[in-house]
Amino acid sequence: MMAEAKKAAPKKAATAASKDADAKGPKHTPPNPKVRGRRKTRIGYVVSDKMQKTIVVELEDRVKHPLYGKIIRTTKKVKAHDENSIAGIGDRVSLMETRPTSATKRWRLVEILEKAK
């Protein structure tokens, strides 16, 4: 007795709906789509204002350790553009991400939230 050859199932005809979906793009949306034009904003403290039109701001980030649950505090220093040189050391400021204005500057001063005493 000879084994019967398995026949491949006939291909289904493409429907109009699937053709439209292929033309528009993927059928699902990526989980976290990056919205164009959204810029990061951060709040930090000015630690240096000795450069012309530039301030150094210390940004603090608090992250919970995944295993032990301890809150870990990390800091990062960034340079920000201060057009009128109005911010001073110790001021609490709001920054916004921007296009690179120099080799190391990618942030700009939005407003001074609290002046140093």
From Swiss-Prot:
Keywords from the UniProt entry: Ribonucleoprotein, Ribosomal protein, RNA-binding, rRNA-binding
Single Gene Ontology BP term? Answer: translation
Query: What GO cellular component entries does it have?
Result: cytosolic small ribosomal subunit
Q: Which GO terms describe its molecular function?
A: rRNA binding; structural constituent of ribosome
| Disulfide bond residue pairs | none
Record keywords: Membrane included? no
InterPro entries assigned to the protein according to its UniProt record, in alphabetical order? NA-bd_OB-fold, Ribosomal_uS17, Ribosomal_uS17_bact/chlr
In residue numbers, the region (Disordered) covers 1-42
Going by the entry's taxonomy, the superkingdom of the source organism is recorded as Bacteria
Where are the bilayer-spanning segments? none
Instruction: Please describe the quaternary structure of this protein.
Output: Part of the 30S ribosomal subunit.
Q: Entry's HAMAP family? A: Ribosomal_uS17_B
- Tell me the function of this protein: One of the primary rRNA binding proteins, it binds specifically to the 5'-end of 16S ribosomal RNA.
Q: Which family does it belong to?
A: Belongs to the universal ribosomal protein uS17 family.
The entry's protein name is Small ribosomal subunit protein uS17
Gene responsible for this protein = rpsQ
